[in-house]
Amino acid sequence: MSKVTVVEGEIYRDARGQISSLNNFHFEGVKRCYIIHHPDTSVVRGWNGHQFERKWFYCLKGSFTVALVEVDNWENPSQELEAEVYNLSEQESRIVCVPAGYANCIKAFEKDSILLVLSDKTMEEAAGDSWKYDKNLWVDWSKY
C-alpha cells in the first residue's frame, strides 16, 4: 500500500478570474520551498532520492508527470521497484505528499511548465541526504 498521499484542492472561477486553493493541506513541517522551471518536454529530471526528507509537489503552470519509488536499498536499489505515477496540472489544484524514503523523477507535459516543491528540511539538513539514480530506471519515459 502506498504511503504517498494526494490532497485535492479547489479551483474557483468567475468573471474576476480564478482562485486555486489547498484548503485541506496543512503546511506543518515545511521549512523550504523552491520552484522548478521546466524548459521543454524532452527533459527528464531525476531520479533524486531522499532517505529522511519529505517532499510535496504542486503544479503552478502547465503539467507534469511525477514518478515516485520507495527505495529498498539506498546503495544499490532493486531495478524491479514499481513506480507510482502522478499527473499534475494547473487545471487541477492538488498536491502530492511524498514521505521520506522515496526517490522522485519528473517530466513536463507542456513547454515552460512550472512546479512548486516544498521540503521539510533546510538546505543544511538536506545536504547529506541526496541520492541520484539514472533517469531510465523504473519508468519508460518514452510513454510520457
Residue ranges and their predicted role:
Residues 19, 96, 104-109:
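Short beta-strand His + acidic residue motifs that chelate non-heme Fe in jelly-roll/DSBH
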